[in-house]
Every structure is written in structure tokens, then in C-alpha cells.
A protein has these predicted regions:
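N-terminal capping/lid subdomain adjacent to the active-site entrance of alpha/beta enzymes
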Residues: 1-172
Length: 172
């Protein structure tokens, strides 16, 4: 498959519920979407889940955009890619920047699956129709609100619940 074009989209999404961690409260989520287009008109999609500032890891939205635009995308444009496994070798000269690499790789995997007429799950070797996921809860105002949120998520079927804490907020 030949990758004809890569389009980057910067998306600012308002969160349904503010999410509070020890870094602060997040009302919006800024992230990147990567669209990989083949020479046959098929599009594959990937997501870059950076944060706006490098508070959690060194990679952030603007650095990922730069890494994609200046370094990674030129490696795949107008290139014939037989299988997405080839990408790791292409990306190896660049250290770290794993979220940017993963976003482009995800778009190419999606494009590959669509080109092959298969599900992405089957191309990746998946054997299940469903995947169990967990949920992450932000810091609540008090322990009662936290317990209420945990109960609600448990009733919704989540079996793994991650709880955020911070000094002086985790004592009760």
C-alpha cells in the first residue's frame, strides 16, 4: 500500500466532567488525530494522546505535532509499505517520542486493515470480540463523593477503577 498523504488535526474536546489530578483540573482535552490516506483513497486513523503541557511525560501536544510533521511523516509519504511492522525500523533513529510514533503507526495499521478488508483486531492477532477496560476517576471533593463515583462505575460494569490521590486529600 502506498501512503499518499498524512493529515494532522488538532482537536480541543470539552470533557463531560472536569478531571482533577495532582496537576490540576482539566476542563478540555487537546490532542491530535492523524489521518493516513492511501493512493487508492482509503483513510486510516490514529490518535495522539499527549497532554497540552509536559507535566506527566516529556512529550506534549506541540512537540508531538513537530515530531510528526518534521521527522516521522516524511519517512512514510509516497512510500510503499507492505506491512505496518516495517514502521518500527523506520522510526528507530528517533529516540522516545512514543506517543507521536504510536499515533502515526495506529493510522497506518488502520489503513492497512481497511486495505486488506479485515478488522484491525484480526490484523493485530486479536482473538476476542470484546475487550475489558477500566476507568480512571479524578480527585473528588470528599471521600463520600469518591465512594459514590466508585459505586456508580462498579454498577456500570467496570472491574478496574483507578483512583487519583494527592497529598492531604487521601486521608480519612
Amino acid at each position: 500500500m502506498k501512503v499518499k498523504e498524512i493529515v494532522l488535526y488538532k482537536v480541543n474536546m470539552r470533557m463531560k466532567n472536569p478531571f482533577t489530578t495532582s496537576f490540576g483540573t482539566q476542563q478540555d482535552r487537546l490532542f491530535l488525530i492523524v489521518e493516513a490516506k492511501s493512493d487508492t483513497g482509503i483513510s486510516g486513523w490514529g490518535e495522539c494522546v499527549t497532554t497540552e503541557l509536559p507535566l506527566y511525560i516529556e512529550e506534549f501536544t506541540q512537540s508531538a505535532w513537530y515530531m510528526l510533521e518534521e521527522n516521522l511523516i516524511p519517512l512514510v509519504i509516497n512510500e510503499e509499505i507492505d506491512h505496518p511492522d516495517e514502521l518500527q525500523e523506520k522510526f528507530n533513529p528517533f529516540k522516545r517520542n512514543n506517543l507521536a510514533k504510536s499515533a502515526l503507526e495506529g493510522a497506518i495499521w488502520d489503513l492497512y486493515a481497511k486495505t486488506e478488508g479485515k478488522s484491525l483486531a484480526s490484523c493485530l492477532g486479536g482473538v476476542h470480540d470484546t475487550v475489558e477496560v477500566g476507568v480512571s476517576l479524578g480527585i473528588e471533593k470528599n471521600i463520600d463523593d469518591l465512594l459514590k463515583s466508585i459505586k456508580q462505575k462498579s454498577e456500570e460494569g467496570y472491574k478496574r477503577i483507578k483512583v487519583k490521590i494527592k497529598p492531604s486529600k487521601d486521608i480519612d
